[in-house]
């Protein structure tokens, strides 16, 4: 019986501590700039645009626009 009460109290305390720390950290990120630059560099490396004069189509993206199969 004592062990059960101790376990219940311990679980309640741990739950309360998690809820308190979750409310305190809402809306804050420690390393916001690291995450945003990592995400940006990853997306830039997969979607680079092609320069003027290079061939373009459905799978390639031009920096300007695609006109008659060539980037302008």
UniProtKB/Swiss-Prot annotation:
Residues 1-22 form the signal peptide. Pfam families: Conotoxin. The modification Threonine amide is found at residue 72. Keywords: Amidation, Calcium channel impairing toxin, Disulfide bond, Hydroxylation, Ion channel impairing toxin, Knottin, Neurotoxin, Presynaptic neurotoxin, Secreted, Signal, Toxin, Voltage-gated calcium channel impairing toxin. Changing residue 67 to S: In SVIA-2 and SVIA-5. The presence of a 'disulfide through disulfide knot' structurally defines this protein as a knottin. Omega-conotoxins act at presynaptic membranes, they bind and block voltage-gated calcium channels (Cav). In vivo, this toxin is a potent paralytic toxic in lower vertebrate species, but it is much less effective in mammals. This is Omega-conotoxin SVIA. It comes from Conus striatus (Striated cone).
